[in-house]
Regions:
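Short helix-perturbing small/polar motifs within transmembrane alpha-helices
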Residues: 1-56, 60-217
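Membrane-proximal helical linkers
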Residues: 164-171, 222-254
Length: 254
């Protein structure tokens, strides 16, 4: 019951975010909207299981971040939420309630991150403004907001489903090196996408796809190596513990 209420509230919040942002800016044009819709849709299809097995890491986070930097909030929210919903229903074949939850989560996350970026003085209209040192704090504010809102909403649904506290789920699922490194890389990749788009226009899509592929592959290798090292250390620890416990049994009374 509580899980259903939570999902309903998140979906309603997503609808409220769309309403608050207003209709997409008509000055943006149909071609840029279509480009970023396809970019986000492609990112949604490139996903990785989360290292702890809870949820997944979506390469769409990079496209989401680039979109909210370059497009007005109204356009960014529509494009990113629509791309995620299409990916869930058409390609991933998720249940409608999960697709609706992801829609609401994406709309809320992107709207708040875009709000943080704009309200802190962020500019993404030209390459000079995007590369300006004055954009450092707005970009950081947007990235932190995106990460906290996104992971917080996911933690809420996992906590209700498994009967745990939100804080415990967030700490176990997101507050560790793999997730933080992955999120940081995706935000930086999104920033790079925005720079490439303002520099080379639609031709930047080819470089972005290549960069995404190699970064995704590198992250897979990084996580696999780190998990293998952790498993090896755990085995060695257990072996040492067993030897300590077994040592008294080897003594003989003379």
């Amino acid at each position: 019951m509580l899980l259903t209420v939570y999902i309903t509230l998140v979906v309603a919040a997503g609808g409220l975010a769309l309403w608050a942002c207003g209709a997409p800016d008509p000055t943006v044009g149909a071609l840029p909207l279509l480009f970023w819709l396809l970019a986000n849709l492609l990112g949604e299809l490139l996903w990785l299981p989360a290292p702890k097995g809870r949820g997944y890491l979506s390469m769409a986070n990079a496209a989401n971040f680039a979109t909210l930097i370059l497009l007005p909030a109204s356009s960014a929210v529509v494009v990113t939420a629509l791309a995620g919903t299409l990916a869930d229903l058409v390609f991933r074949r998720r249940r409608w309630d999960r697709a609706l939850f992801n829609f609401g989560m994406c709309a809320v996350t992107v709207s708040l991150a875009s709000l943080a970026f704009r309200n802190s003085g962020g500019l993404g209209t030209t390459i000079d403004s995007l590369l300006s040192p004055l954009n450092a704090m707005p970009l950081l504010a947007a990235a932190v907001t995106y990460f906290l809102v996104n992971t917080g909403l996911v933690s809420g649904v996992i906590a209700l489903h498994q009967g745990q506290s939100v804080r415990e789920v967030w700490r176990e699922s997101f507050a560790f090196s793999y997730e933080i490194v992955g999120a940081t890389v995706l935000m930086l990749l999104g920033y790079l996408f925005a720079i490439l788009f303002l520099t080379w226009g639609y031709m930047s899509a080819f470089i972005a796809v290549i960069a995404t592929y190699f970064i995704r592959d590198a992250y897979v290798r990084y996580v696999a190596g780190a998990q293998a090292a952790a498993a090896s250390a755990e085995v060695e620890k257990n072996r040492n513990a067993e030897s300590v416990v077994a040592a008294p049994a080897n003594r003989r009374v003379r």
